[in-house]
Amino acid sequence: MFDYSIFAKEIDELKNQGLYTYIRTLESPQGAWLVIDGKKVLNLCSNNYLGFANEERLKNAAKQAVEKWGVGPGAVRTIAGTFSLHNELEETLAKFKKVEATIFLQSGFVANQAVIPAITNEEDAILSDELNHASIIDGVRLSKAKRFVWKHRDIKDLEEKLKEAKDARRKLIITDGVFSMDGDLAPLPEIVELAEKYNAMVMVDDAHGEGVLGSHGRGIVDHFGLHGRVDIEIGTLSKAFGVLGGYIAGKKELIDYLKQKARPFLFSSPLSPADTAAALEATKILQESDERVKRLWDNAKYFKEEMKKLGFDTGESETPITPVMLYDAKLSTQFSKELFEEGIFAQSIGYPTVPKGKARIRVMISAVHTKEDLDFALEKFEKVGKKLGVI
């Protein structure tokens, strides 16, 4: 019989290093406040940027979809699993993103695994930022293309890598739009200029830019005014949109090709009618108003400014993501536990999610937080920070 003690030993080692992830169980819907282990806590670590995860309009849309379409698609989309509701979501997303077409997948993670190996082979070169998301890294691993990893946000290094890849049939530059652990932005205008100079494609994963950046939350491409110059946009429906799923946006020819070649599209069932309808409703709300997006930024600006006044190191974030840098993994884990005891739910992030020696509490501000919520958080961060000698 297999000896499972090897896994137990590895788990013990993770605990000793302060790298073991303790998974909390929610006993309430997503929102500014949660109930965990019977305790009411302020939620500072979800990706529910705009509060859509428990929004009445989305819930009603999901209920109506279940009544009309049932609970599941019943097949993959290429056989008998494409409802007109699915097509409506893709068409609405395309209009919202100002692209020709979109295709949605089961998650943003899956979207990266779908597109990268589908459009590259051993004759091609992929150039990837060193801090790109795990889903991009795994997508690149599924491709047979030659790989070049360029230094984080370093345009000069990217150009050197493009020169090294000059003999490739096709060159694909991939970057996160917003880097999820630090909150910094990709230098997308400079990347696009290099891509045009070296005849390369540009792909941006905008998981943390959707609903956050640009007019009405259209994302980083809109933020920089680069419509028509970025070949592939990857989006998620599980963060600011508050639901589930991911999508690929771009030229109609690309999307048609992916419907024939992308393995997750071909061999796995699509989103349920409820998820599809809720995501569609979220898109409609964003099209109607950017009030929530503005409120999100106002909240984030206030919280960051006050945290800096208290003496916390909040990194170089350019977005509502606020990393509270503690560096030591054990300290970060203890800080998170102390915050929870004070009524704050803010998880510690350590290796391998971030490099060793870069542990932090990643604070995620949302549009549904009130000033009173944020002041409560600031009070508790100050208390724990002083207790643990951080400030």
From Swiss-Prot:
EC numbers listed for it are: 2.3.1.47
What is one GO biological process annotated to this record? biotin biosynthetic process
> Which residues get modified to N6-(pyridoxal phosphate)lysine?
239
The reaction(s) catalysed by this protein are:
6-carboxyhexanoyl-[ACP] + L-alanine + H(+) = (8S)-8-amino-7-oxononanoate + holo-[ACP] + CO2
What CDD domains is this protein classified in?
Answer: KBL_like
What GO terms are given for molecular function? 8-amino-7-oxononanoate synthase activity; glycine C-acetyltransferase activity; pyridoxal phosphate binding
Q: Where does pyridoxal 5'-phosphate bind?
A: 108-109, 180, 208, 236
What this chain does, per the record? Catalyzes the decarboxylative condensation of pimeloyl-[acyl-carrier protein] and L-alanine to produce 8-amino-7-oxononanoate (AON), [acyl-carrier protein], and carbon dioxide.
Q: What name appears for this protein in its UniProt entry?
A: 8-amino-7-oxononanoate synthase
Record organism: Thermosipho melanesiensis (strain DSM 12029 / CIP 104789 / BI429)
Gene name, per UniProt, is bioF
